[in-house]
Curated annotation (Swiss-Prot):
Keywords annotated in UniProt: Cytoplasm, Heme biosynthesis, Iron, Lyase, Metal-binding, Porphyrin biosynthesis
Gene behind the chain: hemH
Cellular compartment(s): Cytoplasm
UniProt similarity note: Belongs to the ferrochelatase family.
Name listed for the protein in its UniProt record: Ferrochelatase
Upper taxonomic lineage: Bacteria, Pseudomonadati, Pseudomonadota, Gammaproteobacteria, Methylococcales
Amino acid sequence: MHPTAARTGVLLINLGTPEAPTPKAVRRYLREFLSDPRVVEIPRVLWWPILNLVVLRTRSRKSAHAYRTIWTERGSPLLAYTQDLRDRLAADGRFAAVEIAMRYGNPSVRLKLEELRNRVETIVVLPLYPQYSAATTGSAFDAVCDTLKTWRHIPSLHFIGDYHRSPKYLEAVAASIRSFWQEHGRPERLVFSFHGLPKCCIDRGDPYASQCQATAQGIARLLELSDDEWLLTYQSRFGRAEWLRPYCIDTLRELPSQGIRHVDVVCPGFAVDCLETLEEIAIANRNEFLGAGGKNYRYIPALNASPAHADILIGLLEPYLALTA
């Protein structure tokens, strides 16, 4: 048993998921997600008609089909893995309460903060985004503040902004890759794929790209990879604006013509597997690579609810125990 900070609670925040793989549920989820000004930095008066008259009409059905390909008996993989990860942290016994919330969809940040409100005196908020971006971590902070500003008594609050260079995080991802290679063999190239971001966000000061680079370099160093054995890419581009390059899908289409026909793809920016990894990376991008002449394409799963992942989060949260002991 570990010493417990009886007054300290933890709120893990993940992005979110529709409640069902149906056009109606996906449309509701996308409306909330894409209405966040942190996510789409376009004036509302211009974005509202585009979102409601074009985007939601065209993407809801297509996205619902993609969700159906990865849906499980427990529902959304993202929610199920996050719940399992929460259970591992709770079982460790160091915190009085551990809850999860989704930035978009359910369970909401407001609901889970209200549940923690009367149970603890200190709340540690940990968004499950290793690399900081205003569109993810910043938005999670907004959601927390939107709730707290309605409370008369606000508990002590600690907010963890990123953990892109956490030694435990880097080593856990590297260890998962080593284990995968021990079982399946090594590829000709390891492709790191992080969620993309409009380049204008970086130009305005978002540290996301530099943190992705630091993470990939740190993992490659632990794996003792030479510069020509790995590369960094970005996925999930949305809209017509320029996003961070190189684009993952374009890279995968080009590699076979360069003589690279065996690749492994890993996505260290995703704490748990979700639509973007299980459908976009593991299925759609695989088809693109094989269609371009590739021979062997493998996706290395996220850390999900593994003991190593729980250990990372405990390491990030543990310093706050001393503050309330």
